[in-house]
Amino acid sequence: TALFADIPDWCTVVITLPTGMEPDGRLSFIKQLKSAGKAVNFTAQTGTPLNNWIARRFEANGKRIDRDAVDRLVFLSGDLMNRLIPEIAKICGYVPGDRVTAQDVEKLAHHIPEADAFQMTEEIARRNYDGAAAKLAELFAEDAEPVEIMGVIGWQVRQLYAAKIAEKSGRGVPFLMEILGTSSEYRARKIAETAAKFSLPALTNGVRLCAECAMKPRENGAITDAEAIKEFLICFAMESRRA
């Protein structure tokens, strides 16, 4: 309390926390901090407000970005502004003209693991197994732990399964957006398009294979053998081809 009492009236102290971090309200310091100040939540922008902000950032750099390129950028690099700012600067620096296309974004933007996992399933749906293996290699190149990689892949397969169930029940993209918890029509549509290329048995088997891979022998609470994930890719590809 004495620490906060020493702050003069003309001074404002701002303490920021990383996205997704929630302060532990049981700690005495956090209790004192909240009593002395005010907690303000900054929610992440999504949908149209985020897309408009991206377009303005490109305009500030003398570029005009196509609408489908905006959707592709958010899909590949995520919707966090602090992650998008350096990506926008990089793309503007490399694109020679004043127009930025979806092809430019595909070539230059950093792919978050979720995007690589989705593209891996896209390649399996196309029966381009070399392409799927290449995408898995990109996931491994990110230096993430195997358990994290399998978590991302499993999440993606479950989304495809949900999209397939929605398709079978005659529900459209708005319903899919709701059950996936996304405000991006582009993302929901891409997932629906890819799910349509799989059979329901293939995706059912995919969910089962993900669970089996997650239950592989563990050491110190983490999957230590990346071979288990490679085995999953082979089995999922075979099941998808057979189903």
Predicted regions and their residues:
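Conserved beta/loop motifs at nucleotide-recognition and modification sites
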Residues: 1-243
